[in-house]
């Protein structure tokens, strides 16, 4: 249902951001726009990193299409355990899918690289949000990252800013 010329306009927006001094092109939750993003990026390398900022539940096939176009991946790794993944996200396979996706991201980028100002230019920054009453899940996420990657290969961000909202009665824990 997109508008004709929307991909051309997206490319113009990317160009405008670069001209205005953006440090990167940060594409947030872009998976459902993969085709348009790839067309807008074209085949050339951009003067700033292209960042794929996603929830981690990505197919390796989609990620392979991004190879050479995306320099930085910012995936969430929400769950290492299937039970909370099924309960809170209706995706019991989230741990397996996200791990495979992160491995593909790393295959593409290799070890992270910062510029002289400390800005990430290439690599994978894995984020994990600590959820209430999910300490074991968090420990398993940390264990997987630590056992899978050597120091200096990926960056890891442990976030604690979760704020529950909505109908909390359905989640007594």
Where are these regions (language model features)?
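Canonical Radical SAM [4Fe-4S] cluster-binding loop centered on the CxxxCxxC motif
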Residues: 1-4
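Conserved AdoMet/S-adenosylmethionine-binding subsite of the radical SAM
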Residues: 14-172
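Glycine-rich anion/phosphate-binding loops
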Residues: 6-9
């Amino acid at each position: 249902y997109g508008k004709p010329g929307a991909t051309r306009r997206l490319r113009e927006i990317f160009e405008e951001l670069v001209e205005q001094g953006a440090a990167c092109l940060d594409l947030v939750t872009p998976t459902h726009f993969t085709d348009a993003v790839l067309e807008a990026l074209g085949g050339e390398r951009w003067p700033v990193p292209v960042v794929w900022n996603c929830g981690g539940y990505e197919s390796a096939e989609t990620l392979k299409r991004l190879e050479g176009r995306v320099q930085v991946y910012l995936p969430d790794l929400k769950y290492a355990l299937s039970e909370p993944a099924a309960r809170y996200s209706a995706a019991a396979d989230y741990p397996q899918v996200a791990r495979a996706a992160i491995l593909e991201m790393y295959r593409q980028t290799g070890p992270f690289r910062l510029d002289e100002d400390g800005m990430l230019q290439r690599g994978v920054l894995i984020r994990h949000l600590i959820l209430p009453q999910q300490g074991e899940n968090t420990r398993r996420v940390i264990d997987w990252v630590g056992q899978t990657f050597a120091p200096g290969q990926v960056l890891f961000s442990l976030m604690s800013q979760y704020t529950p909202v909505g109908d909390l009665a359905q989640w007594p824990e």
